[in-house]
Amino acid sequence: MQKMHNSEYLKELSVNNISYKIYDINKAASDIDLPLKKLPYSLRVLFENVLRTGSKQNLMVFKEWLKNKKSDAEIDFMPARVLMQDFTGVPAIVDLAAMRDAMKKIGGDPLKINPLIPVDLVIDHSVSVDSYASGSSFDKNVAMEMRRNIERYQFLKWGQQAFNNFKVVPPGTGICHQVNLEYLAKVVWHSNGVAYPDSLVGTDSHTTMVNGLSVLGWGVGGIEAEAAMLGQPLTMILPEVIGVKLTGKLTGTATATDLVLKITEMLRKKKVVGKFVEFYGEGLKAMTIADRATISNMAPEYGATCGFFPIDQETIKYLELTGRDKEQIKLVEEYAKAQDLWCNFDDAAEYTDILELDLSEVTSSLAGPRRPQDRVNLGDVSSGFKKELSTFSSNNISIDTKHAVANQNYEIGNGDVVIAAITSCTNTSNPSVMIGAALLAKKAIEQGLKVKPWVKTSLAPGSKVVTEYLKSSGLNQYLDQLGFNLVGYGCTTCIGNSGPLNPEIEETINKNGLVVASVLSGNRNFEGRINPLTKASYLASPILVVAYALSGSLNIDLTNHPLGKNDKGRDVYLKDIWPSKEEIDKVIANSINSSMFVEKYSDIFSGTKEWQSLEVTSSSNYAWDKSSTYINNPPYFENIGSKNSIKDIKSARILAIFGDSITTDHISPAGSISKTSPAAKYLTDHQISPIDFNSYGSRRGNHEVMMRGTFANIRIKNEMCKGVEGGFTINQLKNMQQTIYDAAMDYKANGVSAVIFAGKEYGSGSSRDWAAKGPQLLGVKAVIAESFERIHRSNLVGMGVLPLIFTNNMTRFDLKLDGSESIDIIGLNEHIKPYNSVKCIIKKQNGEMQTIDLILQIFTDNEINYIKHGSIMHFVVENLKNNHI
């Protein structure tokens, strides 16, 4: 627990004869003439955090915010806890282990490297859909997961005994955000007799999901999370808050999925990157916590830091449903009411800007084929896909041409759906859409409909409670009959662990250059993310996932075209089998109860026999195995103790020029490792066969693999290499095309710095610290873009890489770059400040020179310190050694 401040504001709160101390935010606000009720609820939570953990003087920032509805001032945020998943958690624990070694190296106490606040790591990112459409799929996939990841899991188990305040939820339990929502989150925390709002940061961008339960939290990079664990505050500009007023209620066939896709479309257009979004209005009264969580989950997709819902009676009902302790539930209610954190629907809060949405106007929709914000009405999917088809290939593509699949009695063509996945915490946490999908499956079977044979189907819920209520309702059998058998409790298809397709189908796709599709109930559909062979991907509710598995094609308009014929030869349309809200609600009422949650979470930290049998050492410092291809001591601290200086970048080479919306998936892919990639060569050289390559995400504990995987996404397009897809560039020292990794290593060997140019929204997507670590290890000193996504900008700074933006609406196109230029960045020194302007001198091969202004995207003095020390990790280690933290 963090050190407490401003004790004069402590007062007693009695709940069921138990006395708690709380920090009286009403009194503190009154003392500075701040009308607390005019602050958005999310900022009231931050106000309490600053009052409890910081200086009273910093509270004036909130008064300034209310005057201008924004602020340029900094606050220090001290989250109550940290949430991790294994893909981002493994490298974070690797860093902590390396920091212990670094502390020892510079003469400090290694045991100072210990989490000071609770850290929960949920293993959910490693299970893959290898087996599907079978009753034995779950067992087979779990066995495969354990075999592939035993070394990683041993490392995490070592970390659990080596570090204080660190717990691991074993594999096969659930998805971290759903586990957080259903079990870990407290809404109001209490420690040492003091009660305060639950809050967190997580090493996954969808940490935002818990804001639906009124717990303020968002995703950060692993390196920021490490700093937070070790007592370092997260310095942030008090954000603008966009209020979204919700009215009415969902009607007809509209689901929470349709609503979140509408909100994502709306808020992306509004441009809310770096801002809080807060939902309010009478429409909240018709929304369950599950619906709210779906909306909060996709905050990264609409660009916001978080999408917050205040505490109300629905919060209490959800805590009761999920079996939380009665005393805890009463504390939540009494605390919220005492602190003016209880939503009273009076619209008194004031926002930076306001949008309104009538829920009754939401209609059935999907989002795709490449971005979550590209919402398409259900009736327009077929025509919309046909218009998009030409953007996937320069060749003339026909919708009508079909190609035979070897050894099968069917054909496939462009637009056919080859993956239909009920996946992701976004939707599997919501009983209304899960029961809806199961009811649709039941009605489809009763009508004699079947899933098309070329569709790979899967069901991967975010918690064991989902399968429990599906069994309780008797509906699981219908999903099973359609091939939506349980494949695992984890992220699976949503993060690219969709597993291989039928080999004959893969051959047909590759041979004919087909543009086939996936339809999933996930939150991201960036090109190449779901499966390397599905160029088009659409996000949809679980109900529509089942529908598209039945149709097998995007070329069919499901609003007007039949899904098939029943046993009487009569056409069956989607509307004929769509379950009504009344049907769904009845099943939910009869099939879901609190005892399910209590039972399934009673042994959450126990794990399977395989997990329990993993043997680990009891050492406080990790015993690195140099031959390991999973866990390796990273090189970040090789120069720890030596002075780092900020200096101008001279004669740098352009490593790559990228377009808009380059995601962290593009920069550091999480999925499969191509057999022709530099990472594959490294693994092969270490006697790892292709079948055991596993994924990039699973190997994030080994910098050698991850360096080679940086910019290795097969769909990334470097504008220096015309007409070429994948991680290639032109090595200017040799005037030849090479992989980005090989060229970067050549530059480093010759003492040449590298820079990146890019368009808008650079680094959007997952909170993937390797998207910053990788470029740093490749020698990238700066990234110059039109704009950066919030988490990635922070990660770059944390690794000592400078994020810079163009001025005066300039773009890379105005510079007419071809990649052969030499780059100087002038004005970098020990006196730099946040938002400084620097000069960029571009020297062309013909001798021409151009000088432009760039703005440093470093926002706080703390971030300046990270740059001065070389990284946030160096800053933390050196300050811990000197007892400055």
UniProtKB/Swiss-Prot annotation:
This entry's Gene Ontology molecular function terms read: 2-methylisocitrate dehydratase activity; 4 iron, 4 sulfur cluster binding; aconitate hydratase activity; metal ion binding; mRNA 3'-UTR binding; mRNA binding
One of the Pfam families matching this protein, by short name: Aconitase_C
Comment on bound cofactor: Binds 1 [4Fe-4S] cluster per subunit.
Cofactor(s) this protein requires: [4Fe-4S] cluster
Q: Does the keyword Chloroplast apply?
A: no
Q: List the keywords (alphabetical).
A: 4Fe-4S, Iron, Iron-sulfur, Lyase, Metal-binding, RNA-binding, Tricarboxylic acid cycle
Catalytic activity from the UniProt record:
citrate = D-threo-isocitrate; (2S,3R)-3-hydroxybutane-1,2,3-tricarboxylate = 2-methyl-cis-aconitate + H2O
Tell me the InterPro entries matching this sequence: AcnA_IRP_Swivel, Acnase/IPM_dHydase_lsu_aba_1/3, Acoase/IPM_deHydtase_lsu_aba, Aconitase/3IPM_dehydase_swvl, Aconitase/IRP2, Aconitase_4Fe-4S_BS, Aconitase_4Fe-4S_dom, AconitaseA/IPMdHydase_ssu_swvl
State the top-level EC class.
lyase
User: What pathway annotation does it carry?
Assistant: Carbohydrate metabolism; tricarboxylic acid cycle; isocitrate from oxaloacetate: step 2/2; Organic acid metabolism; propanoate degradation
Entry binding sites for [4Fe-4S] cluster: 425, 491, 494
Q: Which domain of life is it from?
A: Bacteria
Can the keyword Zinc be found in this entry's annotation? no
Instruction: List the EC numbers from the record.
Output: 4.2.1.3, 4.2.1.99
Q: Which cysteines are joined by disulfide bonds?
A: none
Q: Name one GO biological process term.
A: propionate metabolic process, methylcitrate cycle
Q: What does this protein do?
A: Involved in the catabolism of short chain fatty acids (SCFA) via the tricarboxylic acid (TCA)(acetyl degradation route) and probably the 2-methylcitrate cycle I (propionate degradation route). Catalyzes the reversible isomerization of citrate to isocitrate via cis-aconitate. Could catalyze the hydration of 2-methyl-cis-aconitate to yield (2R,3S)-2-methylisocitrate. The apo form of AcnA functions as a RNA-binding regulatory protein.
> Which NCBIfam families does the entry mention?
aconitase_1, PRK09277.1, PRK12881.1
Per UniProt, subunit arrangement is:
Monomer.
The family note in this entry says:
Belongs to the aconitase/IPM isomerase family.
UniProt-recorded name of the protein: Aconitate hydratase A
Species classification: Bacteria, Pseudomonadati, Pseudomonadota, Alphaproteobacteria, Rickettsiales
